[in-house]
Amino acid sequence: MTILICIPCLMTGGTEIQTLNLVQALVAGGHRVVTTCYFEYSDDMVVRFQKAGSEVVCLSPTGTRVNGWRGILFLYKGLRRVLKQYKPDVAHVQYMAPGAIPILLLRWLGVRQIIATAHTAADIYPNLRLVHFIQRHCVRVFTCITELAERSFFGTSRLYNENTPLNKRNHFTIYNALPPGFSIVRENRSFVRPITIGVVSRLEEIKGMDLVVPAFAQVKKRYPDTRLVIVGDGSLRVKMQRQVQECDCTE
């Protein structure tokens, strides 16, 4: 089976890693996987997908985002070219901006088996009419990464497993996988000795990163030896560096 995975960007982020895990599982199952990236990408992440066994198609040679009507035409031409070349049996769309547009285009271009995965809760959308239209009329399955997120979209939630029938209900929760060998530290830690708090994330408001430094400043007032290490990049980088100075958290 040929499976098309559609994603807006291939940078260094949680969604990309989850998608990489999906690619590895599909390839291990004997499927041909084609990953199509619409806009931004890093060469390193493209290579990781290729090493996992996926063919990778980057629609934008320069890795730049195209918006508005030009963006819709850009996606239409790019997806049409990919469908003509690879003739996928199933398309899996990561439901991120530009959101519903790739799904609507895939349906218009004749793809009937579409799976959509949302990686956030519904509170980022002003209303859910379009999401519900997509779920009811355009996709075979709409999955979320937590039950809380699924309930925020649809009012109910259900964990999916291999025995779950696909009938009238077509929205489920499938948790992101942890890497093999991942171990959780179970020892109780106290603040008797210094603790280092680590945060790995895109530096964006949607990730709550505008709150990290102010929150840490409150912790540091009570436990002065506590340290914070943030690994990531994004539009909030300069603001967060300024917060560090304003909150006197440089030491």
Question: How should these model regions be labeled?
Answer:
Residues 1, 184-196, 221-222, 248:
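Nucleotide-sugar donor-binding and catalytic loop/hinge architecture
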Residues 4, 189-207, 213-216:
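Conserved donor-binding/catalytic core segment of Leloir-type glycosyltransferases
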Residues 5-13, 17-73, 162-167, 235-237:
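N-terminal strand-loop element at the rim of the active site
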Residues 30-34, 209-251:
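A conserved nucleotide-sugar
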Residues 57, 139-185:
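Donor nucleotide-sugar binding/catalytic pocket of nucleotide-sugar-dependent glycosyltransferases
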Residues 60-90, 100-108, 130-137:
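An amphipathic, basic-hydrophobic alpha-helix
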Residues 70-77, 112-113, 120-139, 151-162, ...:
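Nucleotide-sugar donor phosphate/pyrophosphate-binding loop at the beta->alpha transition
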